[in-house]
Amino acid sequence: MRHKPTPPKGNKSLGNALASKKKVSKNQVVFFDYRDERKLKRFINDQGKIIPRRITGLSAKEQNLLTHSVKWARFLAVIPYVTDEYK
């Protein structure tokens, strides 16, 4: 007979975030274009920070591509560094 999985110890809110995370890519090629503002904003929180890999579900290579695309888009003023409410 199988037992119920126990929630992660420590931060309870983190356990909920990890349980509800979606894998963005599973055997798919993910391409992040620095000009695609809508796609990049999915991976940025309301403070303007890049969401970490453990929440987004991206692989290390994909997260690295995302980070470079977000930083390049910020540099070219495609997306803001921070939102207006945090200025």
UniProtKB/Swiss-Prot annotation:
Gene3D superfamilies, sorted: Ribosomal protein S18
UniProt keyword DNA damage present: no
InterPro entries: Ribosomal_bS18, Ribosomal_bS18_sf
Keywords: Ribonucleoprotein, Ribosomal protein, RNA-binding, rRNA-binding
Top-level lineage group: Bacteria
GO BP field: translation
A molecular function (GO) term: structural constituent of ribosome
Region (Disordered): 1-21
A cellular component annotation (GO) from this entry: cytosolic small ribosomal subunit
PANTHER family referenced in this protein's UniProt entry, alphabetically: 30S RIBOSOMAL PROTEIN S18 (PTHR13479), SMALL RIBOSOMAL SUBUNIT PROTEIN BS18M (PTHR13479:SF40)
Family: Belongs to the bacterial ribosomal protein bS18 family.
Quaternary structure (record): Part of the 30S ribosomal subunit. Forms a tight heterodimer with protein bS6.
Purpose of the protein: Binds as a heterodimer with protein bS6 to the central domain of the 16S rRNA, where it helps stabilize the platform of the 30S subunit.
Entry protein name: Small ribosomal subunit protein bS18
Organism in which the protein naturally occurs: Chlorobium phaeobacteroides (strain DSM 266 / SMG 266 / 2430)
Gene: rpsR
